[in-house]
Amino acid sequence: VQLQQSGAELVRAGSSVKMSCKASGYTFTSYGINWVKQRPGQGLEWIGYINPGNGYTKYNEKFKGKTTLTVDKSSSTAYMQLRSLTSEDSAVYFCARSVYYGGSYYFDYWGQGTTLTVSS
């Protein structure tokens, strides 16, 4: 199982960015994909989830309006778009596969992270 994320991004404040997470080694539509934010010196912050099988999405309220999650089943790729970027969006963003086991969800495989730098 591998989750390969797109490369680092340097973008202007106020613009948008779309990053990708390409899955391999398993059936893409059988597991959820989550996105997680980590700012320097801070903990992990869950952004949202997408079910690649049916396109169902669930977002952290904090990121509603900021983030759109999509998938392309034909290429086994998940995407996250962030809009109206500010310096607060500068962070490393991870995708992570979720698995349901024993009544709970766990993140069992992670991408390597995409570094986003927003410049003014």
Curated annotation (Swiss-Prot):
Q: Outline the extent of the Ig-like domain.
A: 1-111
Q: What else is known?
A: From analysis of the sizes of several other differentiated genes that hybridize to this one, the authors conclude that all of these V regions have rearranged to the same J segment, JH2.
User: Which terms in the Gene Ontology molecular function aspect does this entry carry?
Assistant: antigen binding
> Which Gene3D superfamilies does the record associate with it?
Immunoglobulins
Q: Which GO terms describe its cellular component?
A: extracellular region; immunoglobulin complex
Keyword Calcium annotated: no
Coiled coil regions in record: none
Q: Which GO annotations describe the biological process of this protein?
A: immunoglobulin mediated immune response
Source organism per UniProt? Mus musculus
What keyword terms does UniProt attach to this protein? Answer: Adaptive immunity, Hybridoma, Immunity, Immunoglobulin
In Swiss-Prot or TrEMBL terms, this protein is called Ig heavy chain V region 36-65
